[in-house]
Curated annotation (Swiss-Prot):
Cross-referenced PANTHER family: DEVELOPMENTALLY REGULATED GTP-BINDING PROTEIN-RELATED, MITOCHONDRIAL RIBOSOME-ASSOCIATED GTPASE 2
Lineage: Bacteria, Bacillati, Cyanobacteriota, Cyanophyceae, Synechococcales
List of residues binding GTP: 166-173, 191-195, 213-216, 280-283, 309-311
Known partners and oligomeric status: Monomer.
Annotated binding of Mg(2+), by residue: 173, 193
Name the record gives this protein: GTPase Obg
Source organism of the structure: Synechococcus sp. (strain JA-2-3B'a(2-13))
Length: 347
């Protein structure tokens, strides 16, 4: 399935039905009064959050979404039927903007959340409405109102408590694959991950914690360089960031600083989120190299560094302990993951 996290669509409420002109035509009532009924209300377009959807791909194929029109009025004071509302399913985490003004219209986070985005038009009035002492046989009626027509921009922000960030090839996909049931594409070259991956990591309480592997960011990502800043929006909902640094890189400190600058430049409070700094790929380094690189990274960042090897499953237990603590979930042992111990180096 292709992951599409942005879409533009046009939504249109149904038109209200027209009122009509009619008069009573009954036996023994040769000059009956006006009896034209009112038109029905047009249907509205309503977005509904559905946890079963993970992408906005479907909207590529239905750029215009319309609700049903109201029916015109009938004789004998019968009102026209209202048009059916159009319920449109979107993934949980969809943020809705007016595409023309940029106005934020709503944020559909939880299952069943609804947002009315295009209201149906009111029905017109039949001639019975215009009966008065001065006009006993009105022929006046009104047409139904047009439904609202709005162009929307939809943006999907994944709902995850923990986001994994880092430069391409830092090992983010490997990490999420070994701590959860997620199975992202993994290879030893940059930009293997072209879409965010979600994985549920078990917690001893029985609850699952959702982790998101954010595709590799590079210098200038907040300006759209590389895979662009479109993936940074997925970090906005997270509560904790795991900042993964490749321990085999030529300059791990510089790699750390690049990502920090991108988070800071993007704004939206990303740089202020709690971060767990992690040095990955220690399985291909000797102990002295691990210690030296971790200490330099810790000194530059002003925080402790957890050292791990995602591919060798080393250090994942202490890492998850840090995650649970940051989430306020206590210091219980993580659920069984067949993990190997590792170190945390403090500056």
């Amino acid at each position: 399935m292709h992951f599409i996290d942005q879409a533009e669509i046009e939504v249109q409420g149904g038109n209200g039905g027209d009122g009509i002109v009619a008069f009573r035509r009954e036996k023994y009532v040769p000059a009956g009064g006006p009896s034209g009924g009112n038109g029905g209300r047009g249907g509205s377009v309503i977005l509904v959050a559905d946890p079963g959807l993970q992408t906005l791909l479907d909207f590529r194929f239905q750029p215009v979404i319309k609700a049903e029109h109201g029916a015109k009025g009938g004789p004998n004071h019968r009102s026209g039927a209202s048009g059916a509302d159009r319920l449109v399913r979107v993934p949980c985490g969809t943020v809705v903007f007016n595409a023309e003004t940029g106005e934020l219209l709503g944020d559909l986070v939880g299952k069943g959340d609804q947002l009315l985005v295009a209201r149906g038009g009111k029905g017109g009035l039949g001639n019975a409405h215009f009966l008065s002492n001065h006009n006993r046989a009105p022929r006046q009626f009104t047409k139904g109102e047009a439904g609202e027509r709005v162009r929307l921009r939809l943006e999907l922000k994944l709902i995850a408590e923990v986001g994994i960030v880092g430069l391409p090839n830092a090992g983010k996909s490997t990490l999420i694959s070994v701590v959860s049931s997620a199975r992202p594409k993994i290879a030893d070259y940059p930009f293997t991950t072209l879409q965010p991956n979600l994985g549920v990591v078990p917690h001893p309480s029985g609850d699952g914690v959702v982790f998101a592997d954010i595709p590799g960011l590079i210098e200038g990502a907040h300006l759209g360089v590389g895979l662009g800043h479109e993936f940074l929006r997925h970090v906005e909902r997270t509560r904790v960031l795991i900042h993964l640094v490749d321990g085999t890189a030529a300059d791990p400190v510089k790699d750390y600083q690049v990502i920090q600058q991108e988070l800071r430049a993007y704004g939206h409070g990303l740089i202020d989120k709690p971060q767990i700094l992690v040095l990955n790929k220690i399985d291909v380094l000797d102990p002295q190299q691990v210690a030296e690189r971790a200490q330099r990274l810790s000194a530059a960042a002003g925080t402790s560094v957890v050292t791990i090897s995602a591919i060798a499953k080393q250090g994942l237990d202490p890492l998850l302990q840090r995650v649970w603590q940051c989430l306020g979930r206590g210091s219980q042992q993580p659920a069984q993951l067949d993990l190997v111990g590792a170190k945390s180096i403090q500056s």
